[in-house]
């Protein structure tokens, strides 16, 4: 667990790339006015199975190993009369990189957003978090 619950930014983008021997998944945020200059609260962990949130149904994500990332952010703006989606990008990526095979949104409920990452095998990874992004870097399988 890392980051601060006091910083709940807008969730705006997901980038998935493989470059220089590293498969990278980046979640991007827009800070809200007055928010502290710290990363949003997040949890990143290996899990045996990915499930949808909040239903708990099994998620069909390709892979032999799975990483779940949960972060506090707004994917929908509820401040007006009608809800407005903030994150309007894809909910699923199937890059089939050497290590990262699939990235899929598992849930977006009450400012808690979860995504699953399917890997070709269990691999050590690095997490880099700033107020405007959380990046997971996996060495490309050889």
Task: Label each PLM-derived region with a short phrase.
Residues 1-142:
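Short linear recognition/processing motifs and adjacent strand/loop elements at protein termini
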